[in-house]
Design a protein with these regions (language model features):
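Acidic, serine/threonine-rich low-complexity disordered tracts
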Residues: 22-108, 133-224
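Bacterial N-terminal signal peptides
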Residues: 7-16
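Positively charged n-region of N-terminal signal peptides that target proteins for export
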Residues: 1-7
Length: 224
């Protein structure tokens, strides 16, 4: 009887481990995006589970106006497939104020095929895209990332700035500063926050002298 019970509990533990080891789709993430405190658009990420893979669909829309005229328009659509924590495929299209950009990545047996506006190559390196939702991005002090707009490379240095309470002391986060340079030579300086579950919670960066701030729609009072 004791032997049968032991076997039963071993099987139960193995089955539980098997279920827990499968990838689970993260919670959807939605940001309102502000430029110098004025709302200019959104950045939404939705996730779904497909067998053991995770599908991430990312949509970004910015529109800056002046005296009623649109002076800057940006749209980005990106679909990523992840398997066992590794990027499997990525396909993005970007309209950057009239400039069309693209990036496509597919996992081969022992490398990645990369085809984008900036380059076409094979790479054996693990790819971390600049979609920011995976906190693998901030692990370590340096990280080579793939710009999801055009498949160029951004080398980031990463500084941990410690724990911070955000959204009126409602969310405890870890705060990081990323510094890098785009292929155009433009500096990239980002402040980014992840909550204690590793979920992307907030972001601020400077673009063309303006402060761009991402605020979670869940905590944005302007949505009330």
């Amino acid at each position: 009887m004791k032997t049968q019970l032991s076997i039963f509990f071993v099987i139960l533990i193995l089955c539980t481990w098997s279920l827990d080891s499968k990838s689970k789709a993260p919670t959807d993430i939605k940001f309102n995006v502000y430029r110098n405190s004025s709302l200019i658009g959104f950045h939404n990420l939705s996730f779904s589970q497909m067998n053991n893979d995770i599908k991430a669909e990312i949509e970004i829309k910015f529109e800056v106006t002046f005296l009623g005229f649109v002076v800057y328009d940006y749209y980005h659509k990106n679909v990523e497939m992840w398997s066992q924590g590794k990027l499997k495929t990525l396909d993005s299209l970007t309209d950057k104020n009239g400039e069309e950009l693209s990036c496509s990545v597919s996992k081969l047996e022992d490398s990645y095929k990369i085809n984008g506006t900036s380059r076409e190559t094979l790479s054996a390196e693990t790819i971390i895209p600049t979609s920011y939702w995976k906190n693998e991005l901030i692990k370590g002090v340096k990280k080579k990332t793939l710009n999801t707009q055009d498949c160029s490379v951004i080398d980031f240095t990463i500084e941990s700035l410690g724990e911070k309470m955000i959204y009126n002391n409602k969310v405890l986060t870890d705060h990081y500063k990323l510094k890098g340079k785009e292929s155009t030579g433009e500096d990239v300086i980002i402040d980014i926050w992840y909550d204690k579950f590793g979920r992307w919670a907030k972001m601020i960066f400077i673009k063309d002298g303006s402060e761009i701030e991402y605020i979670s729609k869940k905590f944005d009072k302007s949505d009330e």
